[in-house]
Every structure is written in structure tokens, then in C-alpha cells.
Amino acid sequence: MDTNKRLNLTMLCDFYELTMSNGYFACGMQDRITYFDIFFRTVPDNGGFAIAAGLEQAVEYIQQLHFDDEDIAYLRGRNMFSEEFLQYLRNFRFTGDVWAVPEGTPIFPREPIMTVRAPAIQAQLVETYLLLTLNHQSLIATKANRVVRAAEGRTVLEFGSRRAQGGDGAVLGARAAYIGGCKGTACTVSDELFGVPAGGTMAHSWVQMFDSEYEAFKTYCEIYPDNPTLLVDTYNTLKQGVPDAIRTFNEVLKPRGLTKCGIRLDSGDMTYLTKKARKMLDDAGWQSCRISVSNSLDEHIIRDLLMQGAKIDMFGVGERLITAKSEPVFGGVYKLTAVEDEAGNIIPKIKISENVGKITNPHFKKLYRFFGNDTGKAIADYLCVYDETVDDSHDLEIFDPEATWKRKTVYNFTARELMVPIFRGGKLVYKLPTLAEIQSYCAAQVDTLWDEVKRFDNPHTYYVDLSQKLWSIKDELLRENSR
């Protein structure tokens, strides 16, 4: 293999996407219009909601879809694909339509976060990568948002590159963490590529390279006098590290009139050490010195530290964020929901399972979110058939699609359609926002959720309801396929 060849993401697909596509071609079904939804079934960490992320990379992937000569040669060498199909792939481009929720949107189980309408082969071949990028980044953005909410307004930085599961895991993970609310990253290339603010302090190796900790601190502050952060736990945090930091601040920063500085702890009892360090710094007149901590943090440890009164201004969160260690899989799936017949009529499709939670919602659909006009808070999400509209000037009865006797009348509300057009006829029609805009949007949308939905433990179930028309179509399909 030519290692200088740029990775062609078109071939980043499960092999059965290609065998099915060859089969569609052999059956003359390659141009049949299909509809697929991406959705997930459970929120990671038993949370109340997830955060959508990864759309920008999905857009770039779709724009670049093509098979080159090396790809065709490889497929021909497998002796499984017809020559006519391989010639078809030579001219392959995406010509379909895509709708998706914007990145940073809070999302809930069993509602579509992306819908693809395209000829059968096109829709089939994009499955793997779309799931890959949306699953990964939504997972990390969701975890980051949990961590950021646990920090209660304190700065959170993503520190996980060296523990990430591969290069893309680090680079795109930092991007997703920023969407979820982290203020920056230690991953330099994520700043270069996406504008995620990169920063860092020093490692223990810097301190060990000098004859004394004081000399290491003094040298560092002389090189970087603007807001330096010193790692104080290389030897003895309270007896040596903090006193050496105070001495350095007094000798290097104070004469220059500089007050912004910080210390970082990466080991030990963070509650005890930060309380003691805070008092030492304050007594020395360095109330402006920020205390940062790292070391295998997650939302639960951060919450416990703050409940115990730890004096912490900033958290550096690494492995448990970048790998979403507590639940490292986001279970997004890609399911066929409808096809078009020769006359252009949309025929709903359903996937049935003995596991009720795996039964799909059929048809080409719209997704609405209802907001209370008096509170601005999200009330429920509402799935309906593509040709339905919601008139929010009138009361609307909604019901639990599984326990249909549970009903509620929604009034004084605003209905907002969540899915927006991304591609039409293979052309990008969506203006991609900046990463900072996505982060701000995410924070604003999370604020529309009730605190009960945002609980870490046993959150309130946020309802995703079906319109009566959609529920009836689903019920009819279930009855037809159970006879």
C-alpha cells in the first residue's frame, strides 16, 4: 500500500455495504429512493439527554465521496463485484438530501438526529462513516457537558490526548469536548484545525530537569511571565511546591506588576491540598492565584470535591473524558424508514424486534421541540409524518407512544422544527457555524432543559411523542407484520 496516499474515507465502510450495493445494482434497484434515520436508544451514563456533534465532519465526508482507481482495483481483486457495478462506482457521487439537528442540540432517545434521502446505493454506502463520526463526537460532547455542569461554572479543559484511542480520537474528541462546554484543550492540532483554544503548563519532567524546584519555577516564569501556572506536586506539595511557587511569584511577577498566575496539582488528596494551598497563597497576598487540578477526574469526582469544599478554580480532565470511560459507546444506529415507489409515493418501512425498544419509528418524519412560552423551557419533542404541521396557536394533546393512556395537553407553547436541511440534490445548502457559535448554541439549548432532566442520577424522563397519524401508521405496520 502507498502510505503517502491520502486516506479515502469513501472506503471506510463495512464490507457488507458494498456487497449489498452490488446486489442492489444487480437487481436494478440502485436508483430507488430510500430514507434512513440515524438515532440512538439510550443516553450514556443513564443521563437525561445527549449532545449532538460531528455534523461538520459528516458534511466534509459527503462532499468528498468518490472511488479512485486504487479502490476500484482493490474491489475488482476481491472477485465479488460485477464489472458493471465497478464502472458505476467510478462515477459515484452523492446526489441525495440530508436533514440533521444542528451540532450542540440536546437530543433524546429514538428521535432522528439525521435523515438521509438518497438512491439506495448512495444511502447504503454512507452508513458506516456517518455513524462513526456522529457516535464518537456525540459521546464525547455529552460526557464533556456532564463534566462542565459538575464544575458549576469553573473552567474545564480537555487534557486527554495521550490517553485517547487513536489520533482522530484525540483531535476530534477535543473538538467535541469544546462543543460540550470545555474552554480549551491540550491538543495543539485541534487548535490549528478547529480553533479549540490550546494551552498548557508544564510536566513534572520540567521540574526534574533543574537542580531545584525553585530554579525550575523561576526559569519558567522568566520565560513565560504572563499568567504562568506552576506544577507544585513533583516533590512535596505543601512543604516545598507551594512555598517555591509563592517565592517565585514574589521575585519574578510582583516586581513587574503582574498578578495573574496559577498552580496545578496532579496527585494527592485534592480537597485537603487545595484548602491548604489556598490559605497559603491568600496569606502570602496571592489571592489572584488560580488553583488547577488534574488526575483521572470525571463529573462524579468533581462534584464530590466541590461538595467537600475543595478550593479549585480549574479542572483538567483527561482520560475519563476523551474515552468516555464510564460508558465508551454511543449506540447510534442507521435504519431504513421509507422507500419511494415508481410514482414517487413514500412507502413507510418498519423494523420489528422482540425487544420493544428496538422497534423503529417508520416513515419520513419531522421532529419538533415544544417550548413553554411562559418559561422558555422545553416541554417535549414531537415526531410526525413529513406532511404534517404543528399549529402552536392552538392547544395540542400529546401522548406517550407506548403507554398511550398517558396524555397531556400542551398550551401556550412554541413549536420549533429541529431538523434543518443540510444537502439538497447533493449540494450543500447549510452554512456551517463556527465552533465557538456551536458551543454558545449548545449552552443556550441546555439551559432550556429543566433541572430535573439534567440530574446525573435518576433524571426525569423527557418525552419524545408521536403524532396520532404517525402512531397509527406504526401500529398498522406492526399488525400487518405480526399476522
Model-derived features with residue positions:
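Short coil/turn segments at secondary-structure boundaries
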Residues: 73-74, 142-146, 160, 454-461
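Hydrophobic residues within beta-strands of alpha/beta enzymes
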Residues: 199, 263, 291, 313-315
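N-terminal, Lys/Arg-enriched amphipathic/low-complexity engagement segments
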Residues: 34-90, 99
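Short amphipathic alpha-helical segments
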Residues: 57, 139, 434-438
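Gly/Ser/Thr/Ala-enriched C-terminal appendages of enzymes
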Residues: 2-32, 36, 45-47, 52, ...
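Buried, small/hydrophobic-residue-enriched core segments of structured protein domains
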Residues: 1-33, 42-44, 80, 86-95, ...
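Residue-level "edge-of-site" marker
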Residues: 204, 294, 318
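Short, positively charged
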Residues: 78-86, 166, 394-402
